[in-house]
Each structure stands twice: as C-alpha cells, then as structure tokens.
UniProtKB/Swiss-Prot annotation:
The lineage of its organism: Eukaryota, Metazoa, Ecdysozoa, Arthropoda, Hexapoda. This is Mannosyl-oligosaccharide alpha-1,2-mannosidase IA. Involved in the maturation of Asn-linked oligosaccharides. Progressively trim alpha-1,2-linked mannose residues from Man(9)GlcNAc(2) to produce Man(5)GlcNAc(2). It comes from Drosophila melanogaster (Fruit fly). SUPFAM superfamilies: Seven-hairpin glycosidases (SSF48225). Ca(2+) binds at residue 640. It comes from the Eukaryota. Signal peptide: none annotated.
Length: 667
C-alpha cells in the first residue's frame, strides 16, 4: 500500500537536460530580438501613414467589392436606388448574354476603336463614297461594321498610311465602298457652323443613349418602355409576346450614330433570343414588316451579316399565310404559329387597309433580291396589279379594300392615317429599282395629281394642307401622319423633271411649313395628332382626342428631306426647335414620353416610349444635322419606319444574290 502517490514524487533534471533546455531558450531569444534588425524601415519615413491612408480611401470595398460604375451617368443627382437597380439589371443581362458584351467574338467585325474613329470622322464633311467596280460580297459575316468609316483620300491618306500601319482587315475594308459619317455641309462660316452642327448632332446622340439605356434597364427584351412607371410596355400590334421591338427597330440608328457597345448588345440579343417559332402571336402584318423585316434588311445592307438576312426571311415567311386570299390582298393580322389570318373587325366590313397592304413592296422586293427567292416579290407584285387594274373613284384610292371580293369599302380617302404610306411606296419602289420600275412612277404621278386636284387646299391664312375626303365631302383636317408628304412631294419633284415638278416642290414646301406651324402654335412647340382649318382656326387641334403627341417623326422627316434637297437653313433651325421641345416636355429621368395635350403649359405624359422614337424620330433629327454624304438620297431610300434600304444600281451595298446560270448540257 502506497503512502505517497506517484504524482507527489519530486522529479530531478540531469545536467545534460538542463544544458539542452538552456540552448533552446537562447536560440529563441536571438531569433526574436535579432529579427527586429532584419525588418524593412517602416518607421523612419511616412510609410505607415501612407498605408493607413490607402486603407481609409479604400473604404468598405476592401472587404466588399464595390459594384461597377455606370457607363453613362449624365444625371449626377440620380437616386442611388436606381443606380443599384441598373447594376442588377446589367448583371442580369450579362448572365443572359454571357461575356459577349465585354468581348465580342473575333468575327464580330472591325478593329478595336473603329467606332471612335467614326465619331471623329463625323465632325467634318466627308466625301460621297465612290462605288466600286464590283458589288460587295453578299455576306460579309458580322465583320462589316467599318462600312460606316469615311474614306480617307489624297495626301491625308498617304500620311496616315505611313504613320499608322494597317492590318490586312483594315486594308480590305478601305478597298470597299464606304458609308461615311459626315459633318457640316455649308460653305458659310464653316468653322462656326461645323461646331454648332457637331454640338447638335451630339445632343441627339445623347438623347438616343438616354432612351436606349433606360429601355435596357427597365424593359430589356420586351417591346417598349414605360418610363414613368419604369416597366415594359407592349402594344397590341406586337401580340402578347416579348419580341424586342425597340431593339430591332432602333439598332440601325445606333449603328449610324457609331454607338458600338449598344449595337453589339442588340445584335447579340437578336442572335440569341429573337424568333417567331413556337409562339402563337397574332401580329400586324404591316407593323411587323416595316419594323422587323425592314430593320433586319437595313442591318444586312449595312453589315453583310447573314444573321440579319436569315432573320428577315424568317419573319417574312411567318407573314406569308396572310396573303392566302382570293385576290392576293393580305389580311391585316396573322397568327405566327397557326397561320390563321384575319382583318380588323372595325375596318369597313372586314376590309384590308390601303396603307398596310400597300406598304410591303420595298421590303419584299429587296428580300427576293438578296435571297434569290422570287416568292416575296411575286406577292407584292400581285398587290400592285390589283391596285393598278381596279377602278379608282376620281382617280383616288379609298382606304379600304375587301381581300375576298376585290371591291372597295367605304369611300374614305386620306394621305394621313389608313392611306399614307401606300403613296410613299409607289415613289420609293421606283427609286429603289434604280428608276426602272416605271409602272410605280406612273401610278405615283397619277395618284398625286388626283390628290392635288381633289384634296390639297390652301387656308384663308395661306397654309397648304391635305384634307381627307369622305363620300365626296372634304374634311378640312390634316393628320400628323400626313406631314411626311411634304418630303414626299419634294422628293418626287427632285427625282424627275416633268410638268408637275414645280408644283410638287411648291406643295412639298407648303405642307412642311404648315406642319411646322402646327408645332409653333402650341405652347409646347410640339404638334398635335391632327389639326383643323376653318375661318376661326388654322393648324390647331380642336378635339381632345387630337391634342396628343406620341413622339411622332413625320414632321422631322420632311425637315430632313427638304434640307437635303434645298439646303435652306430654316429646316435645320426648325429641327433644333423640336429637339429643345422634346427635351423640355418629353424627357424624363428614365426615357421619353408622349404628351396628352400639347396645348397645356405643363402637359401630362402618356408613359410610353415608342419604338419608332428610336427608329425614326431621333434618326431623322440626327441626319438633319449631318452631312449630305451620310446616307445620300441618291443611294438610299428610307422605308416608312426610317430604315434605309440601298438603291439598286447606285449603291454597292445592295448585296444582290448572285444569279445562278443554268448548266449547259453541251459537251
């Protein structure tokens, strides 16, 4: 039995163990104190203070990375919550599109910085591009963005070539015809004028960026934007599906303005998301054609990117079932999945509408030429023949035609709503053909002479206007939609000398002046949807449903055309008045809205940013302040949605499909 436990036993170290422990302690002390002399000198200078300042400046981001800065922030007072929303949406878009937004594929075309070069070239007048001896290759891939670069000529070209060696891709692009972005274009006070024009052009470009970025933030991939409520909007013409109408409609405007990043975003969305397959959408044949088919065709002409040709054909094929009628006159609406087509119930007993079935020719004819498929041209030629052969009351075309019987509906004639763009496409089909489609020009002249005789009138105050004709009775009202006709008459005068030339130009100038008057007689300096003429009032809306303005472009279209044809400075001045009015009354923090009453000092906004505001309104204003060599009117013809299409025989960007010759059996 143990009296003392083992734990209480006293232990003794041997001398060898004591020496070993002491040696370890000495070594530790040497390492601790000696290491101080090996440290860098952080105390003999202000390094510690500088490190502290770096940490203080870093803020919380050193632990939580800050979100990326917004690329476009013109309004520094913007609510930080909205900035956060924008950043979250950017992340959503990037997740959807992958890394294409940051680094476009190599096939995506152009050398780095190409669009910056374009912006610099836009500041000075550029020469009209000379056509190449041979047309461009039909499909350029998606590498043809540099077509917007202005060619460098003469000594400047030599000096630039010596100081900036070019890649083979750049040399290839310079060998091809160019579509230059021009600048001023007036011999008077060029330095001052060019600076003013550049300022105005850049302002319109900034408006486009504002409209696009807010659409991207709040309605990306949807059809249109509601800026006030910051959510998507979709009109019935697009069905109930998300077709990216603003993307497709506005993309060529981005391209013309040289907005590369935004253009890439739109193109990538079209490639990845745009399709009419597997959706049961009831679409307007007319609206789908002028916006989607027309927009894709323009982008194909600009770039040679086969994506756009394929998409244009894809959309057109979805519209073809609407043409299956006894007369070949298409219905207004078609279901893209079932092919079932119909007309609007309100349209004069199930009739088709003149301005709709008569506004397909430019797109379908060009689509046949670039695909080699004659079907599309055949469809619109059938429409042409029906309208040519049918009896026309007093030489005029009523707005309604029954597609089953081939008989006119109500005898209502208009150069505004329901009729307008049919007459436009008669002249422009002739222009698009290189002035070889004489049938179209003859039909245009016959129609215009009847309109001049039966519908064009002059008010007591000397204002020229186009009235509506209903059952042989004039309605002294002019639609805003009819304001395009000022440019139409002028273009008809400028492209052929005949007995009507002077009258066409006189009426074109008069109508454009009248539409300007409808703007400046409103407190907002923006024109109403329709305006009337009587002994008591001229160029003013009287009914509440006529007093709104929905960002329409027709008046600015005529300013643009008249400027190009006359170089009368007043058209540019009028255009700038419109820019200021749009900025004052239609701009919001999140886009642009129409107005419910242009006669109120502080009008209520309608909360819709129309896709045509980007496609037409801003494009025409931008071109109004650009050089004539930017989309010259003798090389390009604009469809009714302002999508420019090349003129055959005058423009190397026509990109007609090669003709396949029959194989000979001869040995």
């Amino acid at each position: 039995m143990y009296r003392i436990s083992p734990i209480g036993r006293k232990s003794n170290f041997h001398s060898r163990e004591k020496c070993l422990i002491g040696l370890v302690l000495v070594t530790l002390c040497f390492l601790c104190f000696g290491g101080i002399f090996l440290l860098p000198d952080n105390f003999g200078s202000d390094r510690v203070l500088r490190v502290y300042k770096h940490f203080r400046k870093a803020g919380p981001e050193i632990f939580i990375p800050a979100p990326p800065l917004a690329a476009h922030a013109p309004h520094r007072s913007e609510d930080p919550h909205f900035i956060g929303d924008r950043q979250r949406l950017e992340q959503k878009i990037r997740a959807e599109l992958g890394d294409m937004l940051d680094e476009p594929p190599a096939a995506g075309g152009g050398e780095p910085g190409q669009f910056q070069v374009l912006a610099q070239q836009a500041q000075a007048p550029a020469p009209v591009a000379a056509l190449a001896d041979q047309p461009l290759d039909q499909d350029e891939g998606h590498a043809a963005i540099p077509v917007l670069a202005a060619p460098v000529q003469g000594d400047n070209a030599a000096s630039q070539a010596s100081s900036h060696p070019q890649s083979s891709a750049q040399q290839h692009n310079q060998q091809q015809p160019q579509l230059p972005l021009g600048g001023g274009g007036n011999d008077q006070a060029p330095d001052t004028l060019d600076a003013t024009l550049e300022e105005r052009r850049q302002k319109v470009k900034e408006m486009m960026e504002h409209a696009w970025h807010n659409y991207k933030l709040y309605a990306w991939g949807k059809n249109e934007l509601r800026p006030l409520s910051q959510r998507p909007h979709s009109a019935s013409i697009f069905g109930s599906y998300d077709l990216g109408a603003t993307i497709v409609d506005g993309l060529d405007t981005l391209y013309i303005m040289g907005l590369e990043k935004e253009y890439r975003e739109g193109r990538d969305w079209i490639e990845r998301k745009f399709s009419l397959d597997n959706i049961s959408a009831e679409l307007s044949v007319f609206e789908t054609n002028i916006r989607f088919v027309g927009g894709m065709l323009t982008l194909y002409a600009f770039t040679g990117d086969p994506l756009y040709k394929e998409k244009a054909q894809h959309v057109a094929d979805k519209l073809l079932p609407a043409f299956q009628t006894p007369t070949g006159i298409p219905y207004a609406l078609v279901n893209t999945k079932t092919g079932v087509a119909k007309n609007y119930g309100w349209a004069s007993g199930g009739s088709s509408i003149l301005s709709e079935f008569g506004t397909l020719h430019l797109e379908f004819a060009y689509l046949s030429d670039i695909t080699g498929n004659p079907l599309y041209r055949e469809r619109v030629q059938t429409i042409r023949q029906v309208l040519k052969e049918i009896e026309k009351p007093k030489g005029l075309y009523p707005n309604f035609l029954n597609p089953k019987t081939g008989k006119w509906g109500q005898l209502h004639m208009s150069l505004g709503a329901l009729g307008d763009s049919y007459y436009e496409y008669l002249l422009k089909a002739w222009l698009q053909s290189g002035q070889t489609d004489e049938e179209a020009r003859e039909m245009f002249d016959e129609a215009m002479l009847a309109i001049l005789d039966k519908m064009v009138r002059t008010s007591p105050g000397g204002l020229t206007y186009v009235s509506d004709l209903k059952f042989d009775r004039l309605e002294h009202k002019m639609d805003h939609l009819a304001c395009f006709s000022g440019g139409l008459f002028a273009l008809g005068a400028a492209t052929r000398q005949n007995d009507y030339t002077d009258k066409y130009m006189e009426v074109g100038k008069g109508i454009t002046n009248t539409c300007h008057e409808s703007y400046i007689r409103a407190p907002t300096q923006l024109g109403p949807e329709a305006f009337r003429f009587s002994e008591a009032v001229e160029a003013r809306a009287l009914r509440s449903q006529e007093k709104y303005y929905i960002l329409r472009p027709e008046t600015f279209e005529s300013y643009f055309v008249l400027w190009r044809l006359t170089h009368d400075q007043k058209y540019r001045d009028w255009g700038w008045e419109a820019v200021l009015a749009l900025e004052k009354h239609c701009r919001t923090a999140h886009g642009y809205c129409g107005l419910r009453n242009v006669y109120q000092q502080e009008p209520q906004k309608d909360d819709v940013q129309q896709s045509f505001f980007l496609a037409e309104t801003l494009k025409y204003l931008y071109l109004l302040f650009s050089d004539d060599s930017v989309l010259p009117l003798d090389e390009w013809v604009f469809n009714t949605e302002a999508h420019p299409l090349p003129i055959k025989g005058a423009n190397a960007y026509y990109r007609q499909a090669p003709v396949t010759l029959p194989v000979s059996n001869a040995s």
